[in-house]
């Protein structure tokens, strides 16, 4: 009798660059830091803020055409996540890899204007028409994080543009 062995799909390694981190506070404020550049973020509540941070990470992932690593601190806990260009959010393994995306769906969150649930990758709310329905950036005289060109996100001396989260140990709103 011949034995068959299941073939496991290789797990995807998520690079540690760019460095994306977020700090989320209970009052719906926090910070989003990309490669050392910290920007304030704010929303009406924590749920809107989480979705907005994930939306920013998904936009960065889409520009880089690969998942990005997101470290989220929501005291007292910290999670290391990966956000895919499609808006799917996953916990990273201890080896910094991601399991298959099979069966997972993009993160959804409420529009900042009308509250209608939609994928974090939505550029315009289909219900109220507002652009960037998950935007949480607080603009203080500089470009919004999403306005930064991909060229500003490269490591000096390279052209490589190779990497957000939430939860109770699991990924929230990943329905």
Which positions does each model-derived feature cover?
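Long, charge-rich boundary regions
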Residues: 41-44, 137-175
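Hydrophobic alpha-helical segments that drive targeting, anchoring, or assembly
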Residues: 2-132, 175
């Amino acid at each position: 009798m011949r034995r068959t062995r299941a073939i496991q799909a290789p797990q995807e390694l998520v690079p540690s660059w760019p460095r994306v981190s977020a700090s989320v506070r209970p009052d719906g404020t926090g910070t989003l830091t990309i490669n050392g550049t910290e920007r304030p973020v704010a929303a009406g509540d924590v749920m809107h803020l989480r979705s907005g941070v994930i939306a920013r990470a998904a936009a960065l992932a889409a520009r880089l055409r690969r998942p990005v690593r997101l470290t989220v601190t929501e005291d007292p806990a910290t999670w290391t996540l990966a956000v895919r260009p499609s808006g799917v959010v996953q916990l990273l393994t201890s080896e910094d890899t991601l399991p298959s995306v099979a069966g997972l769906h993009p993160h959804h969150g409420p529009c900042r204007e009308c509250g209608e649930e939609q994928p974090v990758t939505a550029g315009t709310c289909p219900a109220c028409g507002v652009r960037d329905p998950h935007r949480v950036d607080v603009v203080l005289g500089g470009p919004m994080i999403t306005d930064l060109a991909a060229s500003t996100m490269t490591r000096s001396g390279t052209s490589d543009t190779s990497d957000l989260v939430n939860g109770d140990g699991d990924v929230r709103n990943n329905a």
